[in-house]
């Protein structure tokens, strides 16, 4: 790093800070969540991501301590109108997704109580 910067007539300083750990879903819990999502939303509305994502998520602390499954709940308007990104002051959630999320979590809790 410093040699590359020196070659351009500059100085460089590298500082690496500890961040969140990897977020890894538990297969057994993920299977339950996937099944519940397919029952509630239909198979054509459930996407199981297999490829790693380079983002970070503080839920990784929970997942490291207990079997878990992190999932996303879509909140785009059903009419297909554009949606701003999350964590944006212009983001306007379609509040109909709240009931869907509550129903999804209720199904998950009831299913996981029987494991």
Model-derived segments and their meaning:
Residues 1-115:
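Metal-dependent amide/peptide-bond hydrolase catalytic core
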